[in-house]
Amino acid sequence: GRQLPNPEAHWLEAHTRSFNYPDTGRTVQLQDKASLGIKACFLSNSFAAYRLQALMAQGGFPAHLPLGEDTFTAAKLLLSGQSLRYQASAAVYHSHNYNGLQDFQRMFDTGVFHAQNPWLLQNFGKAEGEGAKLVKSQWAYLKAQASQPHHPNFLQGIVQLLSANVMKLMGYKLGRVHQWLPKALVKKFAMNKVFWQPKQ
């Protein structure tokens, strides 16, 4: 389903929701990865339904990930010949006003997820390309909206855009090489602290 930004969402977060969750539905199959790349297996972990038989045929949800169980499962389903349906007419309000540190931590976890699941990027392509598209879209949105009421002025918006995306990129890149970092530092960088606790 479609995620809409909460009324109090920051402009960057509101735009990211509209970028990731357009107002037009679509059905995605494995061959669509040629045009969609990593976005082919993009799925909402907070608003999705699964056919139980198809899900269990893939072993159900993975038990030990820092995040990304939705993307992991969607990719496995596509690779098994299943289709994904994005239903834009079904919508919920769901967004986060993360600060810079939280942006860093969230993307650090994403980097860890990609580093520990190289098959995902091997099959669907790198995430950086989609990130670059988002930044370009944010820039275009900022230029179009900067003069409107309730939007940041242009210079303030540039600072917000740059700072948020620099923190995200740094977090992601460090997450990709987390195995080379001191464990104490990894725990500080991670948003999902439980993932790094000793397993029982």
Whereabouts are the PLM-identified features?
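Short, flexible, basic/aromatic active-site loop/helix in glycosyltransferases
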Residues: 1-2, 17-40
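Juxtamembrane C-terminal module of membrane proteins
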Residues: 161-200
